[in-house]
Swiss-Prot record:
Belongs to the TACO1 family. It comes from Trichormus variabilis (strain ATCC 29413 / PCC 7937). The keyword DNA-binding applies. Pfam families: TACO1_YebC_N, Transcrip_reg. GO terms for molecular function: DNA binding. The keyword Transcription regulation applies. InterPro entries: Integrase-like_N, TACO1_YebC-like_2nd/3rd_dom, TACO1_YebC_N, Transcrip_reg_TACO1-like, Transcrip_reg_TACO1-like_dom3, YebC-like. One of its GO terms (biological process) is regulation of DNA-templated transcription. GO terms for cellular component: cytosol. This is Probable transcriptional regulatory protein Ava_1228.
Amino acid sequence: MAGHSKWANIKRQKAVVDAKKGKTFTQLSRAIILAARSGIPDPSGNFQLRTAIDKAKAAGIPNDNIERAIAKGAGTFGGDNASLEEIRYEGYGPGGVAILIEALTDNRNRTAADLRVAFSKNGGNLGETGCVSWMFDQKGVCVVSGVVDEDQLLEASLEGGAESYEMTEDETAEVFTEVANLEILNQTLKDQGFKVTDAELRWIPSNNVEVTEPDQARSLLKLIDTLEGLDDVQNVTSNFEMSENLMAVSFA
């Protein structure tokens, strides 16, 4: 899980930069619309909406934009947002790396076509539903920031029903739980004084594919970056493992 967490950390750092380009603004606004539509449009009673709003605020999205997205999801703003739907696509990257794409789109044909082009131009191929999803398990993940006492984290994690946790190298920890238990774990950690900076659903690979060849690494990371740059794509997950040095060189 370590390599996956490393990639997740890089993605969070990239999100701050991407926000300046407007890409993350669109993603997070759509996530708010969907959360408000699928539950009550009140964050106090809708955990999915509450976490989507927290992410939007962390990315610097203005409150007016957040309120507008909530209103769109609730159907009180106008415009046709009912056509937005969540779709998961699956495929393979260079070297047989498994890739899951979560999209939020109002035109699934357009989205599939864009994804197919991105895969084909970067050494991969878009597959059929189910071709790689069996290699992943969906989990709830709480990201805890700041100096963390591991014994206290273990105690709080057990109390909150966590399955496991992982200390990372940048003064953060990630605590994993079943999807249905994420809200309880999030609140338990906060009640115990931990600073939870993110609570999300994440696909965790059951097995990783080790990438050691520089050309393959560059092609793979370019593919993932291209996929994440598509307007309809909300999240991209893969099962590769790569050294920090190779990742840094490939991003350069």
